[in-house]
């Protein structure tokens, strides 16, 4: 056991334009080599495209897309008596948000569009309409948890 005090969690400064705490997390996960200005430009261009295409408030579309990607259950490996079981467990809200952002960025990077802002926009729009690779990833995780429901009593 560590004798050190537990560090307080860092507070995420909200986005200056939309006053959201999710957008800076998306920007940080897109960022390569510390080039935050480039990542911000990519995200804000994607949000502008959302605004022009949907004619709705872009932050609402963004939040709805993230909520459509967030998983509610996942599987964790648990070793019991020499056998490893995939045990379904509920996902905490912070982890669900982190997974949603990670899956969104991964799915966006795999798309064939030319610019990253187009990739992010298309993936967000697909997630808003409950389709796309990131939503498929969520469905796969849920399906995996559903198929391993028999091992739920191994939960710790």
Curated annotation (Swiss-Prot):
Keyword flag RNA-binding: yes
Pfam families: Ribosomal_S7
Region forming the signal peptide: none
Species per Swiss-Prot/TrEMBL record: Pelagibacter ubique (strain HTCC1062)
Any one annotated GO CC term: small ribosomal subunit
Protein name (database record): Small ribosomal subunit protein uS7
Phylogenetic placement of the source organism: Bacteria, Pseudomonadati, Pseudomonadota, Alphaproteobacteria, Candidatus Pelagibacterales
Stored PROSITE patterns: RIBOSOMAL_S7 (PS00052)
Function: One of the primary rRNA binding proteins, it binds directly to 16S rRNA where it nucleates assembly of the head domain of the 30S subunit. Is located at the subunit interface close to the decoding center, probably blocks exit of the E-site tRNA.
UniProt similarity note: Belongs to the universal ribosomal protein uS7 family.
Quaternary structure and partners: Part of the 30S ribosomal subunit. Contacts proteins S9 and S11.
BP GO terms, sorted: translation
NCBIfam families attached to this UniProt entry: rpsG_bact
Keyword line: Ribonucleoprotein, Ribosomal protein, RNA-binding, rRNA-binding, tRNA-binding
GO MF annotation list: rRNA binding; structural constituent of ribosome; tRNA binding
Record InterPro entries: Ribosomal_uS7, Ribosomal_uS7_bac/org-type, Ribosomal_uS7_CS, Ribosomal_uS7_dom, Ribosomal_uS7_dom_sf
